Amino acid sequence: VHWTAEEKQLITGLWGKVNVAECGAEALARLLIVYPWTQRFFASFGNLSSATAITGNPMVRAHGKKVLTSFGEAVKNLDNIKATFAQLSELHCDKLHVDPENFRLLGDILIIVLAAHFAKDFTPECQAAWQKLVGAVAHALARKYH
């Protein structure tokens, strides 16, 4: 993926404002609520029976933070996203058997969360840069499937 200086600035500038624990928890909770079939990968998380149960679930919150912390590695390694996610791709493909489409869905959810939290800063140019990033991350995570 080729990044312009402006795209890198838009991504890193917004990322510096992100509360990883809060936005990560919200993104994963939204994924599980909006796309309930994704819950099957989180059976060990206990009660996921309602939106309230999901948003209040400490395991969802913790894993959401973990997911977004990992996403931060992409922000730090924009020029080497494939290598950054090689091990996670292997884990999600070989061991967890996650449908790679779910990576795209989570990326789209993250865009919504960022837009909701940073409406003023989340300009169309910023969104375009972030869409490119979540697409690159989803592709890198799905790489082991190809």
Swiss-Prot record:
Q: In which tissues is it expressed?
A: Red blood cells.
Instruction: Report TM segments.
Output: none
- Pfam families linked: Globin
Q: Name one GO biological process term.
A: hydrogen peroxide catabolic process
Q: Which residues form a coiled coil?
A: none
> SUPFAM superfamilies from the entry?
Globin-like
Instruction: Please provide, in alphabetical order, the Gene Ontology terms of the cellular component aspect for this entry.
Output: blood microparticle; haptoglobin-hemoglobin complex; hemoglobin complex
Which Gene3D superfamilies does the record cross-reference, listed alphabetically? Answer: Globins (1.10.490.10)
The molecular function terms of the Gene Ontology recorded here are: haptoglobin binding; heme binding; metal ion binding; organic acid binding; oxygen binding; oxygen carrier activity; peroxidase activity
What are the disulphide bonds in this sequence?
none
Residues annotated as binding heme b: 63, 92
- Globin domain: residues covered: 2-146
Database matches in PANTHER family:
HEMOGLOBIN FAMILY MEMBER, HEMOGLOBIN SUBUNIT EPSILON
Additional observations: In pos. 135 of beta chain, other birds usually have Arg (the positively charged AA contributes to the formation of the phosphate-binding site). Here the non-polar Gly reduced phosphate interactions, and oxygen affinity increased.
User: What task does this protein carry out?
Assistant: Involved in oxygen transport from the lung to the various peripheral tissues.
Q: Which family does it belong to?
A: Belongs to the globin family.
- Which protein, by its recorded name, is this? Hemoglobin subunit beta
Q: Which organism is it from?
A: Phalacrocorax carbo (Great cormorant)
Q: Lineage of the native species?
A: Eukaryota, Metazoa, Chordata, Craniata, Vertebrata
What gene name is listed for this protein?
Answer: HBB
